[in-house]
A protein has these predicted regions:
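Helix-start (N-cap) detector for alpha-helical repeat units in TPR-like alpha-solenoids
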Residues: 21-22, 54-58, 91-92, 125-126, ...
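Register position in tetratricopeptide repeats
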Residues: 33-34, 66-70, 103-104, 133, ...
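Structural marker of alpha-solenoid helical repeat scaffolds
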Residues: 50-52, 86, 120-121, 154, ...
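Canonical positions in the second alpha-helix
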Residues: 47, 82-83, 116-117, 150-151, ...
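N-terminal leader/linker segments that initiate helical-solenoid repeat arrays
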Residues: 16-63, 69-71, 81, 261
Length: 262
């Protein structure tokens, strides 16, 4: 009889924990849907000790996502690492952790996770792209170039890979190559303001300030409310010793930042 009573009490405890977990998890999902990520992360952390073996993995993954969305990148890496201990080699998680490592400037760790993905999927363009970006930020431009070129071979329309290669050329001071490639990309996407800013920056570095201003003009026409474009424009006017226009651009940038909370 005593054993039966113990079993019944244990069963009630288990059912109670399961109900508590399910209640908390539903609340987490609601908070994520409402984009209340900071609160969601707190509730996921409360739910985690109550999660059974099967539920622990999805709880950790969602916790990591919520942490990323609140800028708690180190904690997100820890959560992804714990999830990967449950499912080693999970491609999606390796990719997310690689992205987090990239944000933390832990480039070798990002490359390591990308290599883990490519051991399973050699032509995974997303992993190749993150790896190439990590190499570029490390200053290993030849390896970065190889990665970007391979992505472009796999996905000829991949703009991020093309822009990565433009940046490699710029870092290596291969300005003519950088200008030629960004020119082709602009022909393909003439309504993308970021592309004109990229070309403007190359021209600025070459000392071609008037040309850089023209490209800055194009970017502002396409996105007139972006304060960063006016900040860059102020720098160009300063290079041309036009302090009046530079100050006007800085004031415009400040006003837009206040208006849109950039």
């Amino acid at each position: 009889m005593r054993h039966l009573l113990t079993f019944i009490l244990s069963l009630y405890t288990f059912v109670g924990l399961a109900q508590d977990y399910n209640t908390l998890y539903r609340e987490c999902v609601r908070l994520v849907d409402a984009k209340e990520f900071a609160q969601a992360a707190k509730v996921f952390e409360r739910a985690l000790p109550l999660a059974g073996e099967a539920a622990r993995f999805k709880t950790l993954v969602n916790l990591a996502y919520s942490q990323l969305m609140t800028g708690a990148t180190e904690r997100a890496v820890d959560s992804y690492t714990k999830a990967l201990e449950l499912k080693p080699g999970e491609t999606a998680l390796l990719f997310q952790r690689a992205n987090a490592y990239l944000q933390l400037e832990r480039y070798d760790k990002a490359i390591e996770d990308c290599n883990g993905i490519m051991e399973q999927h050699p032509d995974n363009s997303a992993a190749l792209l993150i790896s190439a970006q990590a190499y570029m930020l490390k200053g290993e431009y030849d390896k970065a170039k190889d990665g970007f070129v391979k992505v472009m071979t796999l996905e000829p329309e991949n703009t991020n890979a093309k822009l990565g290669l433009v940046q490699v050329y710029q870092k290596k001071e291969m300005f003519n190559e950088a200008l030629a490639l960004i020119g082709l990309i602009i022909e393909e996407e003439p309504s993308n303001p970021t592309l004109y800013i990229v070309r403007s920056d190359i021209e600025r570095e070459m000392g071609l300030y008037e040309l850089a201003l023209l490209d800055n003009d194009e970017a502002i026409k396409l996105w007139p409310e972006n304060p960063e474009y006016y900040t860059l424009r102020a720098i160009l006017y300063e290079k041309l010793d036009n302090k009046k226009e530079a100050e006007a651009c800085r004031k415009r940038a400040t006003a837009l930042k206040q208006k849109y909370s950039f």
